[in-house]
Amino acid sequence: MGLTRQLLGDQISINVGLNFGAVRTMYDLYVSGVPCDLLLLTRAQIDELDAAGCIVAGSIADVGHVKTGIAVRADTKANPDIHDAASLKTTLAGASSIYCPDMKQSTAGLHVLGMLKQLGIWDDVKNHISEHPNGATAMRMMDSSNDANSIGCTQVTEIIYTPSVRLVGLLPKEFELSTVYSIAVPKRSTEPEAAKAAIAKLCGDTNLSVRTAAGFDAT
């Protein structure tokens, strides 16, 4: 969210209306026929649409890999241990609330649900889950909760984007999640050339450091 606002909103001379949400929600909106000049989804979703003949040939570009991590409120001194599955289990089980994105529509939310079940603590923590439409909203709500013992789990881009929360670290290897996000021009775009210019700016080498700072690792 922060990356696209910064690069597409400020650095190119076109007006850009941005619509953010869980990737499955965005995918479903596109399929439903909502007007769209640029699509930023997981690589798997973009490839699916490309195979269906929905994407302008040659317009697909990878923005980067995004990993999933654990966050706390920025104003707490807490530094929970998440270095392995056992410590992560203890940390999550002891949290007063666990803030995460939509567990049906978002990449990270689906992963969190599976992780809690695999750790064997779902039944213990399910009443403490605070689920939100996307990770950025989840992080903002964690900050506004004034609960110093809360934990957030979402993609690092959404943690970095929210100044009022702090990234503790990435999920341990047993639960590592790295998702490739890609951008493309849909065939129903009414501004295909402007869309291609936006992709060139967003994914160009000159903005590699900006993407890295926003939480996107090079593909």
Give residue ranges: language-model regions:
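Short acidic/histidine-rich motifs immediately flanking catalytic phosphotransfer sites
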Residues: 34-37
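Exported/periplasmic ABC-transporter solute-binding proteins
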Residues: 1-20, 24, 28-32, 43-66, ...
